[in-house]
Amino acid sequence: MECVISNNAGAYALERAKNKGIQALCISPKSYESRDAFNQAFVEKVMEIHPDLIVLAGFLVAIPAAMIEAFPNRIINIHPSLIPSFCGVGYYGLRVHEAALARGVKVTGATVHFVDSGMDTGPIILQKAVEVKEGDTPKVLQQRVMEEAEWQILPQAIDRIANGRL
């Protein structure tokens, strides 16, 4: 791992990266005059690093088209649902789990997928199901999905890609 970039200066991932001697950067749209200026700065920074793989985890900013074009099938995302359920515009963080509970699903989970020009529409790499339990709140369900699915399948997907098994 060469670099961790977050759009949130308070992200724990930045602190963890620094503690491991990994470059940690915050590039936030709030720091730029326009979305175009942010997109340009973001793409330029990533191009400087020239990563083999870009892993999105909790990055709640749409990826610029120029980056998707520059890194085809080299950007992956973790999403806290079993795509195609509860995904796309407006479905992120607790909102996903609120929607799952409101719908009354019995099973939810997480998906690792390649990033394409759509929102959560890229080819699926891995999925893992998680039981919804009676009395779950969005926060409780979110934590269970992270622990039982996200934290397991994201490293598995990275390993498969890194070792040419995908």
What are these regions (language model features)?
Residues 1-166:
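One-carbon transfer enzymes
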